[in-house]
A protein has these predicted regions:
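Bacterial N-terminal signal peptides that target proteins for export
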Residues: 1-9
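Bacterial N-terminal signal peptides
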Residues: 10-17
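Boundary at the C-terminal end of the N-terminal hydrophobic targeting segment
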Residues: 19-24
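Sec-dependent signal peptide cleavage junction
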Residues: 25-34, 186-187
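A short, Trp-centered hydrophobic/proline-enriched beta-strand micro-motif
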Residues: 32-52
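An acidic-aromatic
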Residues: 57-105, 163
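Flexible, surface-exposed loop/linker segments and immediately adjacent secondary-structure boundaries
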Residues: 89-127
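Gly/Pro-enriched, hydrophobic low-complexity segments
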Residues: 113-187
């Protein structure tokens, strides 16, 4: 009878701990994938309060991004790691990067350190979601549950603007010229 009780106890412990091991392994795989990722090139679809925009981006850790939008205004978004510029034919907006949600999204060290401490939330069978709150902004970062790649983010800013960006056609660790991250001038 003692052997049976011991077996039942061990079986019970294994059943309880197995999901935790699987759960933590997804986090570890995402962290390891982030550590191995120096840059990404991807197509994107962005929804800002119902306005849909598409384009292509090159992201280089830490904190650099260049995006060319598919629109008639030739909109670009550029961060050199310190500043962020959104420029089009008729607009030029310059921001300190640390005042924007991209400061967090483009900071690999921040993501890794905080993913270690946060719980995962499965949105569905395809994505793993991590939620961060910083400077009155809610930021959700999405990772593919199969290959552990960054596949998007959602930001609710202090003005209650909801911006959701999904990444597709992702290519990792290409040779990238830093010149593309040069802040454009206002013309």
């Amino acid at each position: 009878m003692k052997k049976f009780n011991k077996f039942v106890f061990l079986l019970f412990v294994c059943i309880l701990l197995f999901p935790l091991k699987v759960y933590s392994s997804v986090k570890e795989k995402i962290i390891n994938n982030l550590k191995e990722t120096n840059n990404l090139n991807f197509d994107f679809k962005q929804n800002t309060n119902g306005k849909i925009e598409t384009g292509n981006c090159t992201l280089k850790f830490p904190k650099k991004i260049y995006c060319l939008y598919n629109n008639k205004n030739k909109k670009i978004l550029v961060s050199n790691g310190k500043s962020l510029v959104i420029k089009s034919n008729n607009n030029y907006n310059h921001y300190p990067l640390d005042k924007t949600p991209l400061n967090i999204i483009l900071d690999k060290k921040f993501l890794i350190n905080n993913i270690k401490n946060f719980d995962e939330e499965n949105k569905n069978k395809k994505n793993v979601n991590f939620r961060f709150t910083k400077n009155e902004m809610k930021i959700d970062i999405f990772f593919d549950i199969k290959n552990f790649n960054l596949i998007g983010w959602q930001v609710l800013d202090i003005y209650q603007n909801l911006n959701t960006t999904y990444l597709t056609s992702i290519i990792k660790n290409q040779n990238i010229e830093d010149a593309i991250f040069k802040i454009p001038t206002q013309e």
